[in-house]
Amino acid sequence: MSRKCQITGKKANNAMAVSHSHRRTKKLQEVNLQWKRVWWPEGNRFVRLRLSTKAIKTLEKKGIDAMAREAGINLNKL
């Protein structure tokens, strides 16, 4: 499985590390991904998702059904 948020689709960003002498080298800024068990009331069960921490905060505000609908994800397959 790739390091990608299952709800928002966030993935790593290519960036530059700049030293004090201003030498630039490529670096990868990874997304802060966490495995999260989320209660899905419509399915009456837990769903295990790999989410970014930003998506976890949004999930607590909006709910799993609304976020899955926006992302076009079928929770029955998870």
UniProtKB/Swiss-Prot annotation:
Molecular function in Gene Ontology: structural constituent of ribosome
SUPFAM superfamilies: L28p-like (SSF143800)
GO cellular component: ribonucleoprotein complex; ribosome
Alphabetic keyword roster: Ribonucleoprotein, Ribosomal protein
GO biological process, one term: translation
Pfam families named in the record: Ribosomal_L28 (PF00830)
Superkingdom assignment: Bacteria
Keyword DNA repair: no
Segments of this protein annotated with the region Disordered: 1-23
Family the entry assigns: Belongs to the bacterial ribosomal protein bL28 family.
Alphabetical list of HAMAP family matching this protein: Ribosomal_bL28 (MF_00373)
Protein known as: Large ribosomal subunit protein bL28
Species whose genome carries this gene: Picosynechococcus sp. (strain ATCC 27264 / PCC 7002 / PR-6) (Agmenellum quadruplicatum)
